[in-house]
Amino acid sequence: MASSSGRVTIQLVDEEAGVGAGRLQLFRGQSYEAIRAACLDSGILFRDPYFPAGPDALGYDQLGPDSEKAKGVKWMRPHEFCAEPKFICEDMSRTDVCQGSLGNCWFLAAAASLTLYPRLLRRVVPPGQDFQHGYAGVFHFQLWQFGRWMDVVVDDRLPVREGKLMFVRSEQRNEFWAPLLEKAYAKLHGSYEVMRGGHMNEAFVDFTGGVGEVLYLRQNSMGLFSALRHALAKESLVGATALSDRGEYRTEEGLVKGHAYSITGTHKVFLGFTKVRLLRLRNPWGCVEWTGAWSDSCPRWDTLPTECRDALLVKKEDGEFWMELRDFLLHFDTVQICSLSPEVLGPSPEGGGWHVHTFQGRWVRGFNSGGSQPNAETFWTNPQFRLTLLEPDEEDDEDEEGPWGGWGAAGARGPARGGRTPKCTVLLSLIQRNRRRLRAKGLTYLTVGFHVFQIPEELLGLWDSPRSHALLPRLLRADRSPLSARRDVTRRCCLRPGHYLVVPSTAHAGDEADFTLRVFSERRHTAVEIDDVISADLQSLQGPYLPLELGLEQLFQELAGEEEELNASQLQALLSIALEPARAHTSTPREIGLRTCEQLLQCFGHGQSLALHHFQQLWGYLLEWQAIFNKFDEDTSGTMNSYELRLALNAAGFHLNNQLTQTLTSRYRDSRLRVDFERFVSCVAHLTCIFCHCSQHLDGGEGVICLTHRQWMEVATFS
């Protein structure tokens, strides 16, 4: 359908202006202060109705209600099995976090690292909580979840077996901030058991709102020590994992394979004239330590100056130890670094700071879950984000360079020295939302990733709205992340200044999941989601007014009789005959059902009936819609692919945003991801009715109408 210069546009306004990503939100709507005040007033200790102390809170499988591990479990408040419980004994330290039997060392290693930074820890564990003054059996913690900080309230009933805490505990037996933090995390995700198995960076991100990277040491370790030193100096949280293909086991040197460790420090010492790079690590189990070179009992410490030795070496079986970098590289496979956001770090003293954009999205089967292969027919339907990098990195003075020797680790490599090409370093982080909570339903993390394409200047104007598959092959791929089944997939990209298209995807077309995409850079950038403005061409709303063929008009009069108007069943009979010629071009009859005919009466008639002049207008619409449908019914099967519904609606004169297109696709496609002619007619008639109604409130029938998101979705979906 040709477009007219006139247009009806729906402008969406935010009814919750001022609610930013940094604003604290109450998980389950529970206010710590309100609950505490109510409990103190009533004299009754808090019992959390949203996370009841019982079998479901423990788990669903190995910790399920009938499991061996769940037998004999009692839920007890600390004062019921501890003489003088304290929330915090003096200061919080990394020795406060000791692992129990849950298998969540990834979480505990991250918590241990967090204790090194009191300012960060105070954000997660708000001060002013204890078991003495104003105790009401309620505590709260603040955790980051997919772009928002959540305040999570818990009661202090903890799972106890044979008089001992089942899960995390403190080395100081009467300290309980760590077990209660673990409970808050379990509540956020549905149960304790869903915390079994994970990656340290996942907890790092949830504790800080930062962005996590995984460094694969077997691929390249050049520049690692410098990267770690600078990461720790910038208050990044750092961990390491020794991978295992047969579960957790202890090596002869005292390391636990398949286990997560915290990296808590770096130091350079001289052994004679040889420079030695040392890393300080901590094992959450506490009692199992490295026994090789530079371990607590290693004689090499005796060769160092007393002042240096006393500053570094603490001989205690607390799970913390030093090891040389070359030994670390022999025994560990990955390093995780979580760089912190400006929201947590505060303004940069140099005035630079970080630039961050966060987007929320969803892959929907049949709409925008197009898979990861750029040459696939559905790849173009994936969500798309336009990234513009405006300023190149600054020059770096670091001598030690490597794959991690750049921004966020060992400083930013820049363009000036040696005439190097200007580069912009940016971190792209793709997060699958809420998949850990879905473990209880048998679901797990999908394999996901993203592509980065460069947009040449001559095509830049074409990427203001979702584009078809015809344009994507014209773009050069600038970078891509690995496909991974982790919650967080992060890639450090080094790109030239310019314009880029970021396309996140699942590995397989049709997989469904919610996601968060974040863009981090120290230099200025802009990022926007590729989306359409909601509008309709005025000509598509006016519709053609075609004279009816004599035979069709006579048939109308015969069916209408003395009433001179058709009801729904009569309209169905008329359309069945009128659309007969179209059946010669398809293997599937183009029938219009009774329910759709009732809808057409609502849109084009008086609600219950249709006069001749109204049918004349409807028939003009149907002929145009049929021509559009035929264009997208390439195999003459009588259906079109639901992934192409957006393009068909564009051809009909309707331009819709991603949210509405997703809603309509889910509503009008069938289980085979196909849209037949009747469903297409119903969808387009639905939109015609909406925009015609809106245009009546505009001068001349065209212009802009402002609606809130809620008002628009209510109008657009008739909800």
Curated annotation (Swiss-Prot):
Catalytic residue list: C105, H259, N283
Extract the GO molecular function terms from the UniProt entry: calcium ion binding; calcium-dependent cysteine-type endopeptidase activity
Task: List the SUPFAM superfamilies.
Answer: Calpain large subunit, middle domain (domain III) (SSF49758), Cysteine proteinases (SSF54001), EF-hand (SSF47473)
Ion transport keyword on record: no
Top-level lineage group: Eukaryota
Q: Name one GO biological process term.
A: proteolysis
Give me the ranges of the annotated region Domain IV: 541-719
Q: What protein name applies here?
A: Calpain-12
Function text: Calcium-regulated non-lysosomal thiol-protease.
Q: Which residues form the Calpain catalytic domain?
A: 45-341
Q: Where is the composition biased (Acidic residues)?
A: 393-402
Q: Coiled-coil intervals in this record?
A: none
Q: EF-hand domain spans which residues?
A: 620-655
The record's similarity note reads: Belongs to the peptidase C2 family.
Q: Where is this region: Domain III?
A: 342-540
Q: Where is this region: Disordered?
A: 393-418
Can you name a GO cellular component term?
cytoplasm
